C-alpha cells in the first residue's frame, strides 16, 4: 500500500559557496584561489549530492583537480574533519559567519558560480499556516537577501 502524499517545494533562496581551511594551510590555499585548489586535499559531499556535481563541474571548467581525501553525507562531520586539518571543505556563503563562529577555520575563497538552493517543503501549494509563513519569510529575508 502506497502513501498518497503531495509535497510542494518553496524556494527560500540560493547561496554561493565558501571554501574553508584550518591554519596554517589557509594561507597556502588563499593565495591564488581557486588555482591553489589544484592537488589540495578536499573534503567533499558524496557523489549523490547535487553540490558534489556542481563542484566537480566548476573544477572542470576552471581546470582544477583537488585531491578528494574523504566524502561525507553529514555536513557537520565534514566541518569537524576540516577543523581537524584533514582538508578543505565548503559551506554555503549564507552561513559563512556561523561556520567561522563554530569552527576553528578561516575562509580561503568563495565562488558565486557554484550555487546551493534551499527549499521549504510543505503539503500546501501556497503556504497558509502563519508560523510557517513567518519562518519562510525570515529565511528569505535574513539568509538570502544580501
Predicted regions and their residues:
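Short acidic active-site motifs
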Residues: 4-8, 76-77
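Hydrophobic hinge/microswitch elements
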Residues: 48-106
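A late-sequence structural motif
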Residues: 26-27, 106-146
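Central regulatory/effector-binding core of bacterial HTH transcription factors
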Residues: 1-5, 71-72
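Secondary-structure junction motif
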Residues: 27-30, 41-62, 128-136, 146
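Short beta-strand->loop
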Residues: 8-18, 89, 93, 101-115
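Flexible hinge/capping segments at coil-to-helix
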Residues: 6-47
